[in-house]
Design a protein with these regions (language model features):
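Conserved beta-alpha junction segments in alpha/beta enzyme cores
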Residues: 4-9, 17-316
Length: 316
């Protein structure tokens, strides 16, 4: 009977600790923060100002590891080892988000970015920031919004993630196990600093523009598939091109397509922005096949934002 009582007490204590941790993690880190979306439009139409900028958010991958069974899961209990490249006698992994736990990066395939388009009509200033990440928690987004509002007077800052499945974990559910966060605190701070810096730079780059808006609702149908019934998807590609009035040059473009950036799939161990990298490169610099130019690029900086991908839309 005493053992039963002791056991129940231990279980109760564990439940209390779990509930306390759960409640703590769900707390509002910004109780004073609120958003006022009541916007008074200008009395008369005026000039529209737009600015673009981009800042790298590529992590530094130091320690690597030895995937003896080739399943892209770090399993030291199976005899797998790490390479202490920085010589600090511990494993310093960059956990890749998406698909499954225990997927430490082995290197970098292409850079990750925080890309920003700022729009200002003289009365309201809005920043659209897209980061190469699987997702971004609200409280972390508020950190960026508060900085952007305080430093450069952005009325509203939209934080969008490309939802790439080959970037570091910024959510906290793709670490060493289901019970250990995969978020690297230093990297998180770096992403926030770089995103704010990109917003600041985009504001400095504000110039009068004209906008061209286009869409192709059918051309990308062969490249997206709904992997779950019922078959519902939005295959359309949409673009807003900002052209500087004075020079006639393209400052940048905001493009959107609804698809999961997961073409490299679950056994990839290299940091990558996946297909958004090539999407952006093509819009900026053109489509090439070897040395042959197939389509002219628009120039400027391309900001890619994802669309409705849940359900589940993936590359075909």
């Amino acid at each position: 009977m005493k053992l039963l009582k002791y056991g129940l007490v231990i279980v109760a204590v564990l439940l209390i600790l779990i509930l306390t941790r759960f409640t703590y993690n769900l707390r509002d880190r910004h109780p004073e923060f609120n958003i006022d979306l009541v916007i008074d439009p200008p009395a008369e139409p005026g000039e529209l100002f737009v600015g673009f900028a981009k800042m790298p958010i590529t992590p530094q991958v130091t320690d690597t590891w030895n995937d003896f069974n080739g399943n892209a899961r770090y399993e030291p209990e199976q005899g797998e080892t790490y390479n202490d490249v920085n010589g600090n006698n511990k494993f310093d992994p960059i956990w890749i988000a998406g698909f499954h736990n225990r997927r430490p990066a082995q290197g970098v395939h292409d850079d990750l970015w925080a890309r920003v388009m700022v729009i200002d009509d003289g009365a309201t200033r809005v920043a659209i920031a897209s980061i190469d990440a699987v997702g971004f928690i609200y409280d972390d987004a508020v950190d960026i919004r508060k900085s952007a509002h305080g430093k450069i007077n952005c009325d509203y800052t939209i934080i969008s993630s490309t939802h790439v499945h080959q970037a570091p974990d910024l959510i906290g559910i793709w670490g060493e196990s289901f019970f250990k966060s995969g978020v690297n605190t230093e990297y998180m701070h770096y992403v926030k600093r770089q995103t704010v810096a990109a917003i600041e730079t985009a504001v400095k780059n504000l110039v009068p523009v004209k906008l061209r808006i286009g869409q192709d609702l059918e051309g990308a149908i062969p490249y997206v598939v709904d992997s779950r019934d019922p078959q519902e998807m939005d295959p359309g590609i949409r673009i807003i091109q900002a052209i500087e009035i004075r020079s006639g040059k393209t400052l940048g473009s905001l493009v959107s397509w609804s698809n999961h950036p997961e073409t490299l799939w679950s056994k990839n161990l290299l940091i990558s922005s996946d297909f958004p990298h090539y999407f952006r490169e093509s819009v900026e610099n053109g489509v090439h096949k070897g040395d042959r130019l197939l389509a002219q690029g628009l120039g400027g900086i391309t900001v890619f934002v994802n669309g409705a991908v849940g359900g589940l839309m993936t590359t075909n």
